[in-house]
Amino acid sequence: MSGEPIRVSRQLLSKARACVSDIASLSQKIPFFPVERVMDLGPVAFARVSASSRIGWAAIFLKAYALVARRHPVLRSWYVSGFMSHVATCSASVATLAVNRMENGEDRLWFARLEQPDQKSLLEIQAFVTQCTTRPTEELFKRQLQLEMLPRMLRRFILRWNMNSFSEKRATRIGTFSLSTLAGFNATNRLHPTICTTSLSYAPLDSDKRCIVTLLADHRILDGVVSARVLQELEEILCRDVVGELQCLSPEGDNTSTIRESP
């Protein structure tokens, strides 16, 4: 059967995809391993739908994991390579949130930073997440846009330099942990690329309100047992601290002062 001949077209990789490609390549050099836990998040789901303000799951996990990291410095640490390898530790958490947005007909991946999520209310964190999906990208992601415009060799050099820096700017430029999820699309991405020491991902809740939560961990910094304990503590904080804050946002709760204090 004759038909149209097979043809191949080609085009240059966009600057945005080239930047993501560089981050993915650097991520492959880190010895990550996944640890998973099936969490019973029924209490969180009930408190969430009962709240008078909509709080997304991304905001909930950002707050809860930052509360865990407050107690465990290893979750605020990173590996610094060199002749004598070191471990650097930041005094506070900086979250990196992976955000997908459609720009000029193209899916774009952006990386938003949020300093000290553990010190912020769920309302404040949700406002941040909402801004990441609505505000103009040229306002929110100036540094990433500047990085994309650089030649590839220089861009990779800057990324490697930041990864191996002792400066506090390392945390604000890369983050101490990251969060990436496709739960909103009824999918999972347990092995997503990251250059942070740990990264969270969560699956959609099943009919019993159970959720598979994945923690990617840099084996140079922490081991499997520690990671498993972190996930156990994360579930406890979700069902205790986060539920308590969500209940304060319910119509039956006294959330007047909470709303007044939020920007």
What are these regions (language model features)?
Residues 1-263:
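C-terminal catalytic/motor cores of large multi-domain enzyme assemblies
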